[in-house]
Amino acid sequence: MSATSPAAVVVLAAGEGTRMKSKTPKVLHEISGRSLVGHVVAAARELDPQHLVVVVGHAREQVTAHLDAGDAPVRTAFQAEQNGTGHAVRMGLEELGGAVEGTVIVVCGDTPLLSGTTLGALAATHAADANAVTVLSAEVPDSTGYGRIVRDPATGAVTEIVEHKDATDEQRAIREINSGVFAFDGRLLGDALGKVRTDNSQGEEYLTDVLSILREAGHRVGACVAGDHREILGINNRLQLAEARRLLNERLLERAMLAGVTVVDPASTLIDATVTYERDAVVHPGTQLLGTTHLAEDSEVGPNARIENTAVGAGARVDNSVTLSAEIGAGALVGPYAYLRPGTRLGTKAKAGTYVEMKNATIGEGTKVPHLSYVGDATIGDHTNIGAASVFVNYDGVAKHHTTIGSHCRTGSDNMFVAPVTVGDGVYTAAGSVITKDVPAGSLAVARGQQRNIEGWVARKRPGSAAAQAAQASSQETDGQS
């Protein structure tokens, strides 16, 4: 913990979010690879607080399970009845044992654009000004629906926050709004919450009333104005969800470009907050970078690629393809129109070419699967070439089975490898073969019916047809040349 690290961060995530018109709790809707509350928790963790608690209510089990499945455990408190933000914070403090020594930051769980940097500035301002409470505020073009920051005309000090429904016409003209994010002196917060009343239009305990209570008790109330008002955007409907996704995507792409990644067309590129990259990676238009994807130095992806939970090696190329939970080695080539499913590991300078699908397959260094093939549940050695239109037949109707092909093999076009089967090193297979038995190293495997030509069949069985006429003309031409 640093000198300005808060003692506790309380995240409010108990509301239902009826305006989302969804069976999914509002805070679990996702943008840029994380849920709304997941983004808030990630920002809060940047402050390295001693305690982090999320107050849950609506769909308690679902939200708690989501939080438990995250990168690190999150403590939760339960607000059984939705009695307002003040009541929610009381539930959070009770989970922490009551009064907290030090700074307590309260943040809403539906503000995914809020950055750790802004939260850090709030904590620093709170400590430097020795405030009892510091509100994170913002100047916005349209303050409709937000609580207004009311200041003393003479001193500029914050006197109260008035909710939109309770504001006068004069107060509704104020453009400085409450973000719903606060820093409190933990020693004073608990007592002040106990004095909050419910005589307002909603009949709820407003957390904002704590400001007036503390100010009237002679304590200092301050504000920290956010540098970018868009950070405090709260999500209440699908329109705001889409806007937040757009803004966050722009921020993430800007960060990537400043780190040395070339993004050819940011407007058509999507990136998740969990994606990592190295300098001189190139992202072409229409590309989605999702999940825990990593782009190594000099890698190149797109156009029109979906790269999800995939490690793309240095200098590798992915063109017009989909990769899911795959590993692509340095200098490897994927696509166009390839599909790498989970468990695919493509070796250094290997190739999964046009219309190739792979699943749970390990492909060795320099090995190529160039065209029109399915490789499932397989291990292929180094510097092997798989012929076009090959199928690794891995399913017998009950269970999946594995195929192993060695190094420096050359398999013919239109082969089928019926698992379980092992093909040794240096093997050649003939085109059209169905390989059902193991092939020893250095062998040529031929597994197809012998060709039989029945001469004159077309003339006898299809007399007068175009084929028969063409055959007759060809025969006459041949006879004339002899």
Curated annotation (Swiss-Prot):
Acetyl-CoA binds at A388, N394, Y395, S413, A431, R448. Binds 1 Mg(2+) ion per subunit. It comes from the Bacteria. Residues 1-238 are annotated as: Pyrophosphorylase. It catalyses: alpha-D-glucosamine 1-phosphate + acetyl-CoA = N-acetyl-alpha-D-glucosamine 1-phosphate + CoA + H(+); N-acetyl-alpha-D-glucosamine 1-phosphate + UTP + H(+) = UDP-N-acetyl-alpha-D-glucosamine + diphosphate. Residues 239-259 are annotated as: Linker. UDP-N-acetyl-alpha-D-glucosamine binds at residues 12-15, 26, 79, 84-85, 147, 163, 178, 236, 341, 359, 374, 385. GO terms for biological process: cell morphogenesis; cell wall organization; lipid A biosynthetic process; peptidoglycan biosynthetic process; regulation of cell shape; UDP-N-acetylglucosamine biosynthetic process. GO terms for molecular function: glucosamine-1-phosphate N-acetyltransferase activity; magnesium ion binding; UDP-N-acetylglucosamine diphosphorylase activity. Keywords: Acyltransferase, Cell shape, Cell wall biogenesis/degradation, Cytoplasm, Magnesium, Metal-binding, Multifunctional enzyme, Nucleotidyltransferase, Peptidoglycan synthesis, Repeat, Transferase. Homotrimer. This is Bifunctional protein GlmU. It comes from Streptomyces griseus subsp. griseus (strain JCM 4626 / CBS 651.72 / NBRC 13350 / KCC S-0626 / ISP 5235).
